[in-house]
A protein has these predicted regions:
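Interfaces and regulatory segments of ATP-dependent nucleotide/adenylate/phosphodiester-chemistry enzymes
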Residues: 1-4, 212, 216
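Active-site nucleotide-donor binding segment shared across nucleotidyl transfer reactions
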Residues: 39-72
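Short aromatic/hydrophobic-glycine micro-motifs
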Residues: 47, 93-96, 171-174
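Short, surface-exposed, low-complexity cationic segments
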Residues: 163-175
Length: 231
């Protein structure tokens, strides 16, 4: 099934790729290669990204990708999303393909079976101290106050107060490795997830976005409560 994204450089067409939690373990060698290529392309375009979520946790705790993770997590600014979409054609020349795309501010690119999730953050309209992307939200300092950090033989941007971010997102015991992802899904479970992702891909965007907005509200509320109750 062919999908498409409109960019200022023309229509980018891509194939449906089922991606869901627990689909595979990360291949650290390819992940390092992919991250380095993406950084080079973004640097040349004067676009910056931030290591986030599990990738940030691995960088500051293991100084490596987490063995039981499955992908790379990055954050960019929503205002840079159109420029990043323009780079899809350049990234294709390096072996990357778009795997999934949500206009609200999320996409995944894949190369050699390893994918990178990119979350596009923007100011939260109901609280000037917060920024959000889709159903994730955090204090604005975590996406605005940054510092360079050595990782995988290069230097990447991370939140300056990364200790506080890890406490916020992963809990007080964030320094203790805990495997939360399971990679032993049954064939029926994999097929079910494939069908869900396929239906989502073929539904009209307006229907998908209404559903996403509805399911995101309680999750955002949960995160906001945690932000303002955290010590």
């Amino acid at each position: 099934m062919k999908l498409k994204v409109e960019t200022s450089q023309g229509t980018y067409r891509y194939k449906f790729v089922p991606i869901f939690e627990g689909i595979k373990r990360i291949d650290k060698t390819i992940a390092k290669e992919n991250l380095g290529i993406l950084k080079k392309v973004c640097d040349e375009a004067h676009l910056q990204f931030i290591l986030f979520y599990g990738t940030l946790l691995g960088a500051v705790r293991e100084h490596d990708f987490i063995t039981h993770d499955e992908d790379i997590d990055l954050v960019m600014y929503k205002t840079d999303m159109p420029r990043f979409l323009d780079l899809l054609f350049t990234l294709r020349e390096h072996g990357f393909e778009l795997a999934r795309y949500e206009r609200r501010g999320f996409l995944s690119i894949i190369r050699k079976g390893e994918y990178i999730d990119v979350y596009f953050y923007e100011p939260y309209p109901h609280d000037e101290n917060l920024w959000f992307s889709c159903q994730d939200i955090c204090k604005k300092e975590f996406v605005l106050d940054l510092m360079p950090y050595p990782f995988q033989d290069d230097t990447y941007l991370i939140p300056r107060n990364y200790l506080k971010f890890c406490e916020y997102y992963f809990g007080d015991n964030w320094q203790t490795p805990i495997q939360t992802l399971k990679f032993d899904k049954s064939k029926s479970a994999i097929f079910k997830q494939y069908v869900i992702q396929y239906i989502k891909a073929i539904l009209p965007v307006s229907i998908v976005e209404k559903r996403q907005e509805k399911t995101s509200k309680p999750k955002l509320a949960k995160w906001i409560k945690k932000i303002y109750t955290q010590k």
